[in-house]
Amino acid sequence: MKNLTDSFVYLGHWPSAGSFGFNTDILATNPINLSVVFGVLIFFGKGVLNDLLDNRKQRILNTIRNSEELREAAIQQLENARARLRKVETEADQFRVNGYSEIEREKLNLINSTYKTLKQLENYKNETILFEQQRTINQVRERVFQQALQGAIGTLNSCLSNELHLRTINANIGMFGTMKEITD
């Protein structure tokens, strides 16, 4: 604290006229010494300060330039992504339309296939019915023929006596015998 008070005391005290030198006490220096010190600092510090400011300015400009490049790249990526999105949306629409048309085509194919299958089943059914009708008709004919034959045999048996029956058999045997002689 004593140095600080001493320096204020020295402000009011001027050195004697015969001495020349630098006063290192900043608070006790005169304006000439201060201007010399500031001049030396400005002269030598100007280059260093300019270099520091130029370096800082270059870094700021580089950062701005890099930021602009990154911004441009981001904008380009965004445009590319939007273009890809539009392309994918277009392809999705095409797939959707193609899918709907494919579904309609498959639906028509299924309807046609089902119609053909039903037609074949109808034909099989008709053929089966016709076959069953023919079989039934044949069975009825066979029964009618058997009943007619049994009726004829019954009528013949009731009308013919044993003697008439033997004569008919002999006559038929005779006819077969003459037929055999003619064919030989």
Curated annotation (Swiss-Prot):
Task: Report how it sits in the membrane.
Answer: Single-pass membrane protein
Q: Which residues cross the membrane?
A: 27-49
Q: Which UniProt keywords apply?
A: ATP synthesis, CF(0), Chloroplast, Hydrogen ion transport, Ion transport, Membrane, Plastid, Thylakoid, Transmembrane, Transmembrane helix, Transport
InterPro entries per record:
ATP_synth_b/b'su_bac/chlpt (IPR002146)
Listed under GO cellular component are: chloroplast thylakoid membrane; proton-transporting ATP synthase complex
Location of the protein in the cell: Plastid, Chloroplast thylakoid membrane
Per the record, the domain of life is: Eukaryota
**Example of a GO MF term:** proton-transporting ATP synthase activity, rotational mechanism
What main location does UniProt list? plastid
Q: Which family does it belong to?
A: Belongs to the ATPase B chain family.
Q: How does it assemble?
A: F-type ATPases have 2 components, F(1) - the catalytic core - and F(0) - the membrane proton channel. F(1) has five subunits: alpha(3), beta(3), gamma(1), delta(1), epsilon(1). F(0) has four main subunits: a(1), b(1), b'(1) and c(10-14). The alpha and beta chains form an alternating ring which encloses part of the gamma chain. F(1) is attached to F(0) by a central stalk formed by the gamma and epsilon chains, while a peripheral stalk is formed by the delta, b and b' chains.
Q: What does this protein do?
A: F(1)F(0) ATP synthase produces ATP from ADP in the presence of a proton or sodium gradient. F-type ATPases consist of two structural domains, F(1) containing the extramembraneous catalytic core and F(0) containing the membrane proton channel, linked together by a central stalk and a peripheral stalk. During catalysis, ATP synthesis in the catalytic domain of F(1) is coupled via a rotary mechanism of the central stalk subunits to proton translocation.
PANTHER family the UniProt entry points to: ATP SYNTHASE SUBUNIT B, CHLOROPLASTIC
Q: Any other noteworthy remark? A: In plastids the F-type ATPase is also known as CF(1)CF(0).
Q: What is this protein called?
A: ATP synthase subunit b, chloroplastic
Phylogenetic placement of the source organism? Eukaryota, Viridiplantae, Streptophyta, Embryophyta, Tracheophyta
Recorded name of the encoding gene: atpF
